[in-house]
């Protein structure tokens, strides 16, 4: 197997350069081939995924232009920055992000697209690693792009630490129904609400959809 690298600058033979800050539009360069990728996926992590796929396919004989056509037809998968609701009140997105790096890159991509929106993030710490406290020092920095953050965890000491580190923006989810009511009560036009979990989150996104659709 061949080892192929790429970068986000012209120092490499293979690289990508964003045309938009949210990385939904980028220039893709592989050797002497340059092409334009425009697709619905946000964030640099998705641009890196696209670049990896393009280069891998190129090794199998697929032209860069053909790979880009396929990527531009890709509409995403469930729970990867999935647009659940968009109306004159709010935008609701559901995402599978469940560890600090994924949370950070997802929120950064959303912030780059929804620059003027207030971002309300609701995050469930569901995995054993997240609940163990191993990543606690990374969680507040991971959510710096969000204006308000709701956390759900079985670890009460972990929740207290998160609140202590960012008291102005941190809230705790004790009840899904109560949280839905609270979010609906203070949400305002142009808000972006994003739920993040690798589980069902006790039906939170569906409950928010129902409440915010009315």
Model-identified regions with their sequence ranges:
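Extended acidic/charged loop-beta regions that coordinate divalent cations
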Residues: 1-36, 73, 78-80
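Histidine-centered acyl-transfer/condensation active-site motif
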Residues: 39
């Amino acid at each position: 197997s061949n080892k192929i690298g790429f970068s986000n600058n012209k120092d490499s033979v293979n690289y990508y350069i964003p045309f938009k800050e949210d990385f939904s539009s980028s220039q893709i360069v592989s050797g002497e081939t340059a092409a334009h990728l425009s697709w619905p996926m946000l964030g640099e992590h998705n641009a890196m995924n696209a670049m990896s796929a393009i280069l891998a396919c190129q090794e199998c004989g697929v032209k860069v232009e053909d790979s880009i056509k396929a990527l531009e037809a890709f509409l995403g998968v469930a729970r990867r920055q999935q647009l659940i609701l968009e109306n004159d009140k709010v935008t609701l997105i559901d995402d599978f992000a469940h560890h600090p790096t994924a949370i950070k890159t997802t929120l950064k991509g959303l912030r780059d697209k929804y620059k003027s929106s207030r971002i309300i993030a609701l995050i469930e710490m569901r995995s054993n690693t997240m609940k163990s406290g191993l990543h606690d020092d990374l969680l507040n920095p991971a959510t710096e792009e969000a204006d308000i953050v709701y956390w759900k965890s079985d670890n009460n000491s972990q929740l207290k630490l998160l609140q202590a580190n960012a008291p102005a923006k941190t809230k705790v989810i004790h009840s899904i129904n109560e949280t839905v009511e609270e979010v609906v009560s203070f949400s305002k036009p142009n808000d972006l609400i994003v739920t993040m979990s690798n589980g069902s989150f006790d039906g939170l996104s569906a409950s928010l959809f129902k409440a915010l659709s009315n």
